Amino acid sequence: MLAVEIQMNTDDIGVLSPTSTCHTFDESADGYGRGEGVGAIFLKRLSDAIRDKDPIRGVIRGTAVNANGKMTGITQPSAKAQENVTRTAYQFAGLDPNDTSYFETHGTGTQAGDPTEVRAIGNVFIEDSQREELLVGSVCVPIS
């Protein structure tokens, strides 16, 4: 955050909002506002948490990644790549996307990123289902 070079580089490629506010999934989306936040996740083997009688808030059942550093980059997101990695994570976890009622997004607040992400989410969670709605959110808005 404090390095002026990073601020200048992100401004040069057009991802920073001139209003310094992230308008995720909004027609006025014009980039993101830089901000700082901390999220902490404490991981423990499920068997250990049960043994220790810890409150269990969630269980990680599967993960997936598809960024290799060789693709087009952050200014040209791929809906197909996002769709594929989401489907892979669900397959690894043994979960059915139709059982999902809420999806937390990246939510960049950019004209390229938001529609691409929504398209991928729709392809995974809406296209082949009978669902009427899927709640979608992004932590980017309150942080930036």
Give a label for each model feature.
Residues 1-144:
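Condensing-enzyme catalytic core of the thiolase-fold
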